[in-house]
């Protein structure tokens, strides 16, 4: 008889049945709003340049690639979905597998389900409202509240994140007993992220979902810079019961600016001893052809269902997490 004891799913069959129903309801939510479901590749010849993301790599050795064609498992379907938008797809969503060669734990699995959708003609606030509608439907929770990134820092840390210098940020870190990390950190955004995780996140989204919006422009990623305040980006995140659920943008449409951001990311990667990543030229070509003004958001489905079912770990809603795969 086999000595392997962990062959069974980590999630109960009852939870998997509830998960299937929630997934079905999510699809109905978008069908009722006329949003097209799409499928895009799970592998690509290019990948993200983000210094915080680590993709899985593989090789295709089939016909036409005898020397091996390097491919990356997708950390997000974003680039391919924006190529569809540039081809006049209209509003689209996708619920599929993504892969990140990073953490595995209470809220993380290297293979996970992402819900991502894009809304032409939506500004950031209108998309935030739609995310709120979905959360209320799936979680049966109260309507959300919203705080700007600046308001959140002022409320919980009594510091303005848009103007404070690194020395001031280190002073606040010391009050949170984080000097051992902050005193040697030279990157201002890393210091801000340290303070946000330790001094802001524990206070937000406890009773109702909380949107944090207008992140510093230096953390724009693929978001537009605000036309009203060039210190901030049109970017938001959503938190509920200690869990980061979603990350959204009013999407950057300028191909030249996007290339500059990718190149800046790669310079940072090299400085940090990380591999330089290939830039997705097809994605940039789509931006050059014309990405419509739009907003988009990526939401972690496993985390959402974990909250909906009131369980403690995403392994309670995934049949076979990485250590049982």
UniProtKB/Swiss-Prot annotation:
GO biological process: lysyl-tRNA aminoacylation
EC number assigned by the record: 6.3.2.-
GO cellular component: cytosol
Gene3D superfamilies named in the record: Bira Bifunctional Protein, Domain 2
SUPFAM superfamilies per record: Class II aaRS and biotin synthetases
Residues annotated as binding ATP: 100-102, 109, 244-245, 300
Keywords carried by this UniProt record: ATP-binding, Ligase, Nucleotide-binding
InterPro entries registered for this protein in UniProt: Aa-tRNA-synt_II, aa-tRNA-synth_II, aa-tRNA-synth_II/BPL/LPL, EpmA, Lys-tRNA-synth_II_C
Reaction catalyzed: D-beta-lysine + L-lysyl-[protein] + ATP = N(6)-((3R)-3,6-diaminohexanoyl)-L-lysyl-[protein] + AMP + diphosphate + H(+)
Record-level Gene Ontology MF annotations: acid-ammonia (or amide) ligase activity; ATP binding; lysine-tRNA ligase activity; tRNA binding
Source species, domain of life: Bacteria
Residues reported to bind substrate: 76-78, 118, 251
Free-text function comment from the UniProt entry: With EpmB is involved in the beta-lysylation step of the post-translational modification of translation elongation factor P (EF-P). Catalyzes the ATP-dependent activation of (R)-beta-lysine produced by EpmB, forming a lysyl-adenylate, from which the beta-lysyl moiety is then transferred to the epsilon-amino group of a conserved specific lysine residue in EF-P.
Subunit structure: Homodimer.
Family statement drawn from the similarity comment of this UniProt entry: Belongs to the class-II aminoacyl-tRNA synthetase family. EpmA subfamily.
Protein name: Elongation factor P--(R)-beta-lysine ligase
Protein encoded by which gene: epmA
């Amino acid at each position: 008889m086999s000595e392997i004891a962990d062959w069974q799913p980590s999630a109960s069959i009852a939870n998997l049945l509830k998960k299937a129903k929630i997934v079905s309801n999510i699809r109905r939510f978008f069908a009722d709003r006329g949003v097209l479901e799409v499928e895009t590749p799970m592998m690509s010849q290019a990948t993200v340049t983000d210094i915080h993301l680590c993709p899985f790599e593989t090789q295709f050795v089939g016909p036409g690639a005898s020397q091996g064609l390097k491919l990356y498992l997708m950390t997000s379907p974003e680039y391919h979905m924006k190529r569809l938008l540039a081809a006049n797809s209209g509003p689209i969503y996708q619920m599929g597998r993504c892969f990140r060669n990073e953490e595995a734990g209470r809220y993380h699995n290297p293979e996970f389900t992402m819900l991502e959708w894009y809304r032409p003609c939506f500004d950031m606030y209108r998309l935030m409202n739609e995310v709120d509608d979905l959360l209320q439907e799936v979680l049966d929770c109260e309507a959300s509240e919203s705080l700007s990134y600046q308001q959140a820092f002022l409320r919980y840390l009594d510091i303005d994140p848009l103007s404070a210098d690194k020395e001031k940020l280190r002073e606040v870190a010391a009050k949170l007993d984080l000097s051992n990390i902050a005193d040697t950190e030279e990157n201002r955004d890393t210091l801000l992220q340290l303070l946000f995780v330790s001094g802001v996140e524990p206070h937000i989204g406890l009773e109702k979902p909380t949107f944090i919006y207008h992140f510093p422009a230096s953390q724009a990623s693929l978001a537009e810079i605000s036309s009203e305040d060039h210190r901030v980006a049109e970017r938001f995140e959503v938190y509920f019961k200690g869990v980061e659920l979603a990350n959204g943008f009013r999407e950057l449409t300028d191909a030249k600016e996007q290339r500059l951001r990718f190149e800046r990311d790669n310079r940072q990667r090299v400085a940090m001893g990380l591999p330089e990543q290939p830039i997705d030229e097809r994605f940039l070509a789509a931006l050059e052809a014309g990405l419509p003004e739009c907003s988009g958001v990526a939401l972690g489905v496993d985390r959402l269902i974990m909250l909906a079912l009131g369980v403690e770990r995403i392994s309670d809603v995934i049949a076979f997490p990485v250590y049982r795969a």
